[in-house]
């Protein structure tokens, strides 16, 4: 059985302020028509269940906690939040990995985004997002 999928990578190394979404970057792999990426979101255009995997590497200019949360249509996805502590500013790299299953209801479209939270804004050196329609 073939599954629709998308895999995006952003390794531009941009700082992302707290409360903002992380740009998803370039499409590296894509199969099928029900998944697309634009700016800071992955667009899901067919009903069903989708497996989402996110891996992000980052540092921060200040000591503190960095939180990344997966959101579906602006609402946090339950269990898809990760926090790492930066103890040494600008030189310490940290990684957050998230996995979740989301659902798109019948006759609906949905947008997935990754939002920054915590006490310090990260500089994300790499974020990879994979989504597979199950």
Residues of each region from the PLM?
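Extracellular jelly-roll beta-sandwich "head" domains, especially the C-terminal globular C1q domain
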Residues: 1-134
């Amino acid at each position: 059985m073939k599954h629709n999928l998308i895999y995006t990578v952003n390794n531009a190394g941009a700082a992302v302020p707290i409360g903002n979404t992380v740009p998803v970057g370039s499409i590296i792999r894509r199969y099928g028509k029900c998944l697309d990426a634009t700016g800071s979101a992955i667009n899901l255009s067919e009903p069903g269940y989708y497996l989402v995997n996110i891996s992000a590497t980052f540092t921060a200019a200040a000591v503190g906690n960095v939180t990344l949360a997966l959101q579906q249509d602006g609402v946090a996805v339950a269990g898809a939040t990760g926090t790492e502590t930066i103890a040494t500013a600008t030189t310490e790299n940290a990684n957050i990995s998230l996995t979740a299953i989301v659902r798109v209801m019948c006759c609906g479209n949905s947008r997935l985004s990754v939002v920054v939270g915590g006490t310090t804004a990260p500089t994300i050196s790499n974020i990879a997002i994979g989504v597979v329609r199950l």
